[in-house]
Amino acid sequence: MRSRHFSVVAFVLTSLLAWAAPASAEWSELVKEDEATYYFDKEAVMPVHVSRFAWVLTDLPKAEKTPTGENYKSMMLRVRMYCKNDTVVRLSVSYFDKQMGKGKEVSSDDVHEWRPREYPIRPNTYLAALKKEVCGGSKAASG
């Protein structure tokens, strides 16, 4: 019984540490625009077959509203990027009251669909810049 309890506690702590990792990430700038600056965590990119999991941080110059009405100044987005077919899936998003993913998490949303919707990666966007960084050339995209 004691070892089972320890296993559950260890699993929960490991899960929390994995979720907290992006908060202490080394963010690399992707794109800077008037309305937002986009970053990604190079160290957290995880290749799985022909796709890549990545964290994206969006920093805003002034507060905006979440879909539920809370003010936020930054958001962290977890995505799965499909390198071969130029699509991306949003897995989760967290909104923060301060820039660079700091301060209080004011809202979050995780995709709970069995098959999340894929969106096309449009040229000249932060997602196109992310694809270039995480998928690289044809060798990275094919393996």
Regions found by a protein language model. Name each.
Residues 9-18:
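Bacterial N-terminal signal peptides
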Residues 21-77, 82-143:
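N-terminal secretory-pathway/extracellular module detecting exported/lumenal segments
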Residues 1-10:
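Bacterial N-terminal signal peptides that target proteins for export
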